[in-house]
Amino acid sequence: MKKTKINIEYPLNTKSNKLIWTLISTAEGLQKWIADYVKEEDGRFVFTRGEAWTENHSLTAKILHREPMRSVKLRWENEECDEAYIELSIAKSDITGQQTLSITDYAEEGDEDNLRDLWEGDLERLHHSSGL
């Protein structure tokens, strides 16, 4: 199935690469803003939304690449589109020195707005949990 590439850039209220790197590349960091529970095992992240004692849903993403202090690239294990991936990367403005979180993801045709809304909710949780 053909998917559309989505790019989102989110300015962050920090100049600390280390803080952002922890939030995008570790289970503990991702758990603060993407899912209720995240664990890393065997080169994969398992993302769970919902509580263990109630209804919950888990998805597993293989870690394709990590460039320390720069980016992490993931691919959902159930992904049918060969070119689809998720990439979270850190960029720095040459002018302001401000850090930006860049997100690349892929949406099914007609589902682009829903995917953007999902990421906007995640980014709002990132802001509330970390102040960024």
What are these regions (language model features)?
Residues K5-N7, N56-T60, D82-E87:
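Short, surface-exposed coil-to-beta transition loops
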Residues I8-L19, D42, A52-N56, I95-G97:
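Short, charged helix-to-loop "capping" segments that act as catalytic/coupling loops
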Residues Q31-N78:
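Glycine-rich portal/gate segments that line the openings of hydrophobic small-molecule binding cavities
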Residues R75-H128, L132:
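Beta-strand/loop substructures that line and gate deep hydrophobic ligand-binding cavities in soluble
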Residues M1-K39:
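Hydrophobic ligand-binding cavity/cleft-lining segments
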Residues L19-W21, L30, F45, I63, ...:
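Hydrophobic pocket/interface hotspot
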Residues N17, L64-M69, I90-Q98:
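A short, structured loop/turn motif at beta-sheet edges
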Residues E9-N13, K62, S89:
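Generic structural detector for well-ordered beta-strands
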